[in-house]
Amino acid sequence: LKGNTMIPDKLKDDFNSLRNMFDELKREIDKNVVREENYKGEFYEISPYSYQRNRFKQGKIVGNVTSLKTTNNLFTYYFDVKNQIIEIREGLELKNQFYYTFFIYEKELMKTIAYDNSKRIVNVRYYLYGSNGKIEKMYSKGSRGSREETYFYENDRLQKIVIRQFDRNDIEQDTLQHSFDYKSNGELKSIILSTELYSETIYQET
């Protein structure tokens, strides 16, 4: 039965209040940057298997950024004194155009705010941690709709993520599931995307 979104009101308020806050937010975040790292492609998992779930392999480190012919797919990670990622800059096909994601850490919560290359807000996300220190819920509010992800673990290992999707009027649309299979040594083997109608392998370790 499709229902209404369970997206927290606070998240909706944040999405609206942060809509035009790019410059101010970037100024505040940048004050806390102590180092940066550059990669071609995504390198760090923001949530469990975040880039694998989007069908990508892990990015490669870039030693000398000035030697690159293009900034397309260049990911720059900015860290604070606690070695936490507080900003990600993602290069686009257009020369020297970037998407930005900012990170704010609170008790049992990680908040991300994403903007496009025109400083328009893309989404705000809440990642909620459980007593095991692992992400249990992710709520996202974006310009095109919202989503709720629930993470299920067994023996401290992620087994599946159930993804509920809602349109911009908060009416529930599709429910997806990502299921995770592991090698005998505990490394990720594959990810299967399934709906009520079909399933497909979206990531396969070779």
Regions found by a protein language model. Give the residues of each.
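Buried hydrophobic residues that stabilize the cores of well-folded domains
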Residues: 4-206
